[in-house]
Regions:
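Elongated, amphipathic alpha-helical interaction scaffolds
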Residues: 1-300
Length: 300
């Protein structure tokens, strides 16, 4: 039985909601909410940038989805959905934002022509899990914003590149969502299991996003693409899990091997030390006996 709403974290559905002219108002509302922009700085219009070398229905690298747009002030936004935590993920996010910044200049343009770039990334995992122990780092909230600032005084003078992360796993599902950010987290996490449009998502941007994800409106081609994307994510998740298990097994084997070698070394070391101690004890005893024999010979 098909669900009422498709998973918005899936490549095809994410771009259907946030990367089309038809639902551009959803993208604008999403950016305004996550960037927590005041009325005077709110985004009122965006222009979707063309995807770079991406086929109509992407069937590779499903865990990475992005949408690029620019607002009326020229600020560029790289909106990305990341399903799986892969090695080098943070570096790739920084690289993509930096690339969007540096690729703005054409021949004849100068540095003042550069516009700010903001990377907005939704993660379906704990990118910064809460640390353990007495030296643990401060907890990073569900919605975090990062930019360059002066190290000692904290002055924020360099805002050309900014990074925003929404970690869905940090959403507290034990209570109804209160803020707009919490409602977006709720939307991303719960949409595939919803049977009706809940009251907390009855406002326009969320309702429109759910309508875009309504499975009954999918064509057969779109449904097939959605199913293939979901299967590809599961395959990728399984491959990562298998790689981790194999690495763990290899680590255990290597650890046992190193442990045995270390044990041999330690055993030899302890044996030598014990031999020295035993030799000293035997030498002392032999010396005492020899001294007594010499004393007796002197008396006789």
């Amino acid at each position: 039985m098909r669900p009422l709403f498709a998973d918005p974290k899936t490549d095809f559905v994410f771009k259907k909601i946030f990367g089309t002219e038809e639902h551009k108002s959803v993208l604008i509302a999403f950016l305004n909410h996550l960037l927590e922009l005041g009325e005077e700085h709110r985004i009122v219009e965006v222009h979707l940038l063309p995807p770079e070398q991406r086929p109509k229905v992407q069937e590779l690298k499903y865990s990475i989805v992005d949408v690029k747009c620019v607002d009326a002030r020229g600020t560029i936004y790289v909106v990305e959905m990341q399903v799986l935590n892969v090695e080098g993920f943070e570096k790739r996010v920084v690289y993509n934002v930096a690339k969007a910044y540096t690729s703005q200049l054409d021949v004849g343009q100068t540095y003042p022509d550069l516009n700010d770039v903001i990377g907005v990334t939704i993660c379906d995992f704990d990118l910064w899990p809460e640390g353990e122990g007495p030296q643990k780092e401060p907890a990073v909230p569900m919605l975090s914003r990062w930019r360059m600032q002066e190290q000692h005084g904290g002055a924020r003078g360099l805002g050309q590149l900014q990074l925003v992360f929404l970690e869905l796993r940090k959403y507290d599902a034990s209570r109804p969502p209160q803020t707009m950010v919490e409602k977006w987290a709720y939307f991303f996490r719960e949409a595939p299991s919803l049977k009706v449009v809940p009251e907390v998502l009855a406002e326009r941007p969320f309702k429109e996003a759910l309508e875009a994800a309504r499975v009954a409106l999918f064509t057969d081609e779109e449904w097939d693409a959605y199913i293939r994307a979901g299967m590809a994510i599961q395959d990728e998740r399984g491959a990562l899990s298998l790689a981790r298990k194999e690495a763990l097994r290899e680590g255990r084997k290597e650890g046992r091997k190193e442990g045995i070698e270390e044990g041999k070394k330690e055993g030899r070391k302890e044996g030598i030390e014990e031999g020295k101690k035993e030799g000293r004890r035997e030498g002392i005893e032999e010396g005492k006996k020899e001294g007594m024999r010499a004393a007796i010979r002197g008396i006789l």
